[in-house]
């Protein structure tokens, strides 16, 4: 499932899933190091990977 980081607030990032349009709050610790607003991610097997 593909998503985009739309905002970062403190220890949390807000990601918007492309297929559903749902916005979710995700702990920064679960995301790849150096993540920034606008980055595209793939969520698969309960892990996020930068694409």
Predicted regions and their residues:
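Structural detector for short beta-strands of small beta-barrel domains
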Residues: 1-8
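Short aromatic-glycine-enriched beta-strand elements
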Residues: 11-15
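A short macromolecule-binding patch
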Residues: 21-30
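Short, Lys/Arg- and Gly-enriched loop/turn segments at beta-strand edges
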Residues: 46-51
